[in-house]
Amino acid sequence: RRQRDAAVAAGASGIEVDRWIAERFTLPKVDLPTLEGETARFAATMLRSLWGLGSRPLPNLIQLAEFRGIRVNGLPEVAASVDAYSTWYEGFPHVFLARRKTPERARFDLAHEIGHLVLHRHRGPGSRAEEEREADAFASEFLMPAESVVEYLPPNPTIDEILRVKRAFAVSAMALTYTVHKLGRMTDWIYRTTCTALSQRGFRGGEPDGMVSYERSRVFPQILASSKLGVVTGKRIALELRIPVEDVRAAMLDAELHAVPDGPGQRLVDRVRQSAPDRTGRRPVRSGARAEGLRPV
């Protein structure tokens, strides 16, 4: 309970950091449809189509989400029991990631939360367990489209083939094996023996020879590298928002540890706003009433 409360508080801090940035810089507009009522796998296929992704393996998922207007923040160590959660807040989609397991797991967690954002924006009294299954199914199809799995892998693939393709899709070997079996491309017996063999090779709790690092944000390094507003640091933002600097750094996915954005690509922070709006009299999101909408998913 304490760690869940810490995750909610960290989410509130993340929203404050995002608001501070949005008041001073122009960020990508939200391009995330509501696909409630659709099946999870159809929604994943539809979102890929709307975003022009085809069925190919996805690039850096954090940067893809940022480009489509999703605000992606990190969670601090005190929220260790929460892998990720998401919420819509004042018209903006937010995802909060712990990133304490493997980078492949973090990608799946982010895809899972995008599934919640498009499928469960207006939640009713439905089954939370069913929503979790739907978000998992969305993430699987979004990261590993059936069309591509069939193209890349033969029926009943070998472990070496699984490992080769899982690197191409930047997913865990176990997740890919499960997907292949779920698609009817692997017999029950081979599925069990493959999972056993992968477990013996360390793939149950980790990802040997996997991604070398977590995917990085493009937005936060660009904010920190900007000189038009003077030197921008996590400490400065923390002082202006009156929140702990550790919360700011976690919210910014530890971007201060990296001097430059992660590789070439389109600049997401287009320009500095001419003036930041007056915050006087605005009740901060950290207040109890404003934070009620934040719930770990």
What positions do the PLM features span?
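Short juxta-domain linker segments that transition from a proline/glycine-rich
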Residues: 1-297
